[in-house]
UniProtKB/Swiss-Prot annotation:
Protein name: ADP-ribosylation factor-like protein 4C
GO biological process terms, semicolon-separated: endocytic recycling; intracellular protein transport
Organism: Homo sapiens
InterPro entries, sorted: P-loop_NTPase, Small_GTP-bd, Small_GTPase_ARF, Small_GTPase_ARF/SAR
GO molecular function, one term: GTPase activity
Organs and tissues of expression: Expressed in several tumor cell lines (at protein level). Expressed in lung, brain, leukocytes and placenta.
Length: 192
């Protein structure tokens, strides 16, 4: 991918919103990325926000401003405000909670249909892959009907275990790559 600093200015921070149903593991992902260790969390009432300079992978050194928005039903109407004008969306899914995948799908499709979010790169983190009975990535992709998202939405499904950090670096690298491609595409459209 070349020199990262030529792709994103050192002074620029990517705006990333983390969404998903309650108990999917969003806050665990956030603090694993920030501290590179497990931090015991409590349900998010409202949101958490952190500026994090990524420390691993292709996106190493890139500064990101993360917004981790609570996933309880009463907080979901706020998702639209927090996801407006974002560089990327991370949608965390509990790979074991099969009973709530339909609900996760409905909420994800709502978010990606907001006019402001059309075409925004999407990283789906299939969390809790370390647990027995976790669904494989292909099944999660199918259950979430990702193929039905608008064609402009690029996405990647990343198997992960937020508690130990497995898969998070790879997922962030993929999200960063999708953000760069989108920016390049938007820049080319402006030139026309």
């Amino acid at each position: 991918m070349g020199n990262i600093s030529s792709n994103i200015s050192a002074f620029q921070s990517l705006h990333i919103v983390m969404l998903g149903l309650d108990s999917a593991g969003k806050t665990t992902v956030l603090y694993r990325l920030k501290f590179n260790e497990f931090v015991n969390t409590v349900p998010t009432i409202g949101f958490n926000t952190e500026k994090i300079k990524l420390s691993n992978g292709t996106a190493k050194g890139i500064s990101c401003h993360f917004w981790d928005v609570g996933g309880q039903e009463k907080l979901r109407p706020l998702w639209k405000s927090y996801s407006r004008c974002t560089d990327g969306i991370i949608y965390v899914v509990d790979s074991v909670d099969v009973d709530r995948l339909e609900e996760a799908k409905t909420e994800l499709h709502k978010v990606t249909k907001f006019a402001e979010n059309q075409g925004t790169p999407l990283l789906v983190i299939a969390n809790k892959q370390d647990l027995p009975k976790s669904l494989p990535v292909a099944e999660i992709e199918k259950q979430l009907a990702l193929h039905e998202l608008i064609p402009a939405t690029t996405y990647h499904v990343q198997p992960a275990c937020a508690i130990i950090g497995e898969g998070l670096t790879e997922g962030m690298d993929k999200l960063y790559e999708m953000i760069l491609k989108r920016r390049k595409s938007l820049k080319q459209k402006k030139k026309r």
